[in-house]
A protein has these predicted regions:
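Short, ordered loop/turn segments at secondary-structure junctions
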Residues: 1, 43-44, 68-71, 78-82, ...
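Non-catalytic interface/targeting segments
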Residues: 1-7, 26, 38-41, 100, ...
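Glycine-rich nucleotide/cofactor/substrate-binding loop typically near the N-terminus or early
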Residues: 1-44, 125
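Gly-rich Lys/Arg/Thr-decorated short loops/hinges at beta-loop-alpha junctions or inter-strand turns
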Residues: 5-13, 42-49, 67, 155-168, ...
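Catalytic, metal-anchored helix/loop core of enzyme active sites in primary metabolism
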Residues: 19, 56-60, 174, 213
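Glycine-rich nucleotide phosphate-binding loop and flanking beta-alpha elements
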Residues: 23, 46-47, 201, 237
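Internal alpha/beta core interface subdomains
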Residues: 33-154, 161-164, 248-253
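Long, structured protein-protein interaction/assembly regions in large complexes
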Residues: 108, 118-254
Length: 254
């Protein structure tokens, strides 16, 4: 039923042999092995339908072989890179970049399969399949670069962040937002928190978001300077006015 179509001596040898090795060239010619210079492969979508039937075997084999032999072969696993394949044929640095991306892609793929099979709470080894969600303004400190990575198919609100206005988020902002969400979600009544460096400097409840936020800011207005505001209820125009005033007086994020 086609299970071993690509696990084939001719294919794998054609990908792996060294074009600069005279002995390899002679053997390839003797055995009728074709020279395969480009491998473009999309894996079975295991993340869409986690099942034994969607575990790819032949695809990863070809990808791994091509990535290992990046000096002689171009491997592409992302459709966004297809337009760069021809250029990579004459650019070893680009081929190496593609190889690194291929190995990361395989690791991402296999980690999901491992999670599917595992019944251990704390396995001896673990790899998290993280996918980049967005570039950040900086990491924990302004001199550091950073990006936000999210576990796929999770309902994390961090993966749904949408900037409506202002500067891009920093790593510190993301941490503060997470800390704020984990704080206010503990309450059923209207609750607001002002978070700074992962710690709340003001938490309050009220009859609505407006009252809760006003109380949270007034709990420690000095420490609230530059903080992140989080509420567990929708904001109305009156709440937005408090946010606007807070923004005028500090460099906090909304």
């Amino acid at each position: 039923d086609g299970r071993i179509k690509t696990i084939n001596f001719q294919i794998e040898s054609g990908i792996l042999f060294d074009r600069k090795n005279k002995f390899h060239l002679e053997q390839a010619e003797e055995l009728g092995v074709p020279q395969i210079d480009i491998v473009i492969c999309n894996l079975y979508p295991f993340w869409e339908k986690p099942d034994v039937s969607t575990i790819d075997v032949g695809g990863p084999t070809m990808i791994r072989a091509a990535a290992k032999n990046y000096q002689n072969c171009v491997v592409a696993v992302d459709p966004k890179d297809y337009g760069l394949v021809e250029k990579a044929l004459d650019d070893e640095f680009k081929r190496k970049q593609f190889a690194a991306k291929a190995f990361y892609h395989l690791s991402f793929y296999d980690s999901q399969i491992g999670s599917f099979f595992s019944e251990e709470k704390f396995p001896e080894e673990i790899t998290l399949p993280l996918r980049k969600n967005q570039e950040l303004r900086y990491g924990e400190n302004p001199h550091q670069s950073g990006a936000l990575y999210i576990l796929p198919k999770t309902n994390s609100p961090l993966g749904k962040l949408k900037k409506l206005w202002g500067r891009d988020l920093s790593g510190t902002n993301v941490g503060d937002i997470y800390a704020g969400l984990e704080t206010v979600r503990q309450f059923s009544e209207s609750t607001a928190a002002v978070i700074k460096h992962l710690s709340p400097c003001g938490i309050a409840t009220g009859k609505d978001a407006e009252e809760a936020l006003d109380r949270a800011i007034k709990a420690d207005p000095v420490s609230a300077f530059g903080g992140v505001i989080v509420t567990n209820k929708p904001m109305d125009i009156e709440t937005a006015k408090i946010v606007a005033l807070f923004k005028q007086e500090s460099e906090g994020n909304i």
